[in-house]
């Protein structure tokens, strides 16, 4: 079977359908290097998302609280375009952008119903990274 010829035509992806969703969930994953904010409906289908890198920060600036704030504002704005009004927040990870992201979701105009910490706790699982000696 001969290989397929490549063309320069771009595929047009799925059209963004404006959903009308009043409440959903906001998942904030804050690591030491980045912060990712995903806003879903109550079934778990992603409506909007943003990360520190997606907003325009590179390198070590992605891990700052300000970058997390910008990512949360961006995701909240996109979700509010779909009619989102109220979210339940689930926070995961040890990063520095946790509280800032929650505050900026509220400042963007989303009503926060509840805040849950869903950081996974090991029952002595993987060995952690070695301590830094600076």
Curated annotation (Swiss-Prot):
InterPro entries in UniProt: Ribosomal_uS11, Ribosomal_uS11_bac-type, Ribosomal_uS11_CS, Ribosomal_uS11_sf
GO molecular function: rRNA binding; structural constituent of ribosome
GO cellular component terms attached to this protein's record: ribonucleoprotein complex; ribosome
Pfam family name, one: Ribosomal_S11
PROSITE patterns linked: RIBOSOMAL_S11 (PS00054)
UniProt-listed Gene3D superfamilies: Ribosomal protein S11
Key words, A-Z: Ribonucleoprotein, Ribosomal protein, RNA-binding, rRNA-binding
One GO process term, biological-process aspect: translation
UniProt cross-references to HAMAP family, sorted A to Z: Ribosomal_uS11
PANTHER family cross-referenced by the UniProt entry: 40S RIBOSOMAL PROTEIN S14/30S RIBOSOMAL PROTEIN S11 (PTHR11759)
Function recorded in the entry: Located on the platform of the 30S subunit, it bridges several disparate RNA helices of the 16S rRNA. Forms part of the Shine-Dalgarno cleft in the 70S ribosome.
Assembly: Part of the 30S ribosomal subunit. Interacts with proteins S7 and S18. Binds to IF-3.
Family label: Belongs to the universal ribosomal protein uS11 family.
Record-given protein name: Small ribosomal subunit protein uS11
Gene coding for it: rpsK
């Amino acid at each position: 079977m001969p290989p397929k010829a490549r063309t320069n035509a771009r595929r047009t992806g799925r059209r963004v359908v404006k959903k009308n969703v009043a409440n959903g969930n906001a998942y904030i994953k804050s690591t030491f290097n980045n912060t990712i904010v995903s806003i879903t409906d109550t079934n778990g289908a992603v409506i909007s998302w943003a990360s520190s890198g997606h907003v325009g920060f590179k390198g070590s600036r992605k891990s700052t609280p300000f970058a997390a704030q910008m990512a949360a504002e961006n995701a909240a704005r996109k979700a509010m375009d779909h009619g989102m009004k109220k979210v339940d927040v689930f926070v995961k990870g040890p990063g520095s952008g946790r509280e800032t992201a929650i505050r900026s979701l509220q400042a963007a105009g989303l009503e926060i119903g509840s805040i849950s910490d869903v950081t996974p706790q090991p029952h002595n699982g993987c060995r952690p990274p070695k301590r830094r000696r600076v």
